[in-house]
From Swiss-Prot:
The modification Phosphothreonine is found at residue 68. Its main location: cytoplasm. O2 binds at residue 65. The modification Phosphoserine is found at residue 4. The gene is MB. It catalyses: Fe(III)-heme b-[protein] + nitric oxide + H2O = Fe(II)-heme b-[protein] + nitrite + 2 H(+); H2O2 + AH2 = A + 2 H2O. Gene3D superfamilies: 6.10.140.2100, 6.10.140.2110. This is Myoglobin. GO terms for cellular component: extracellular exosome; sarcoplasm.
């Protein structure tokens, strides 16, 4: 299920737009995640108290975490499917410490696609959307495999 060179180029092209404002994009992704799937908010002790979108937009901690999430994802995407070294510690922490189910990774993948579509429609046409969907699915499948190795049934 790997991506072609052309598909990776589409993914990295739009990701270049994201990197111009990782914190802003990340904050918007997390807000969409929490609004669309409020149950995910319960996994974040630091953000549980944020109930409204305005509270979320005003949270520097949320913005910082959004930056962290998208920085890590960008590092993985740039590996073009050769992300073993980057995935192992991420899977370890998300399985054993944070206990994040794979389903939640699907939810955040959807939120990422929605943010990219709304902020960068010119760089995120159907072909780029398909490529990003494949890249994020590859990431989730690899995380799920690592979870299984760790004995986490997320």
């Amino acid at each position: 299920m790997g991506l072609s060179d052309g598909e990776w180029q589409l993914v990295l092209n739009v990701w270049g737009k994201v990197e111009a404002d990782l914190a802003g994009h990340g904050q918007e992704v997390l807000i969409r995640l929490f609004k669309g799937h409020p149950e995910t908010l319960e996994k974040f002790d630091k953000f549980k108290h944020l109930k409204s979108e305005d509270e979320m937009k005003g949270s520097e901690d949320l913005k910082k975490h959004g930056n962290t999430v998208l920085t890590a994802l960008g590092g993985i995407l740039k590996k073009k499917g050769h992300q073993e070294a980057e995935l192992k510690p991420l899977a370890q922490s998300h399985a054993t410490k944070h206990k994040i189910p794979v389903k939640y990774l699907e939810f955040i993948s959807d939120a990422i696609a929605q943010v990219l579509q709304s902020k960068h429609p010119g760089n995120f046409a159907a072909e780029a959307q398909g490529a990003m969907k494949k890249a994020l699915e590859l990431f989730r499948n690899d995380i799920a495999a690592k979870y299984k190795e760790l004995g986490f049934q997320g």
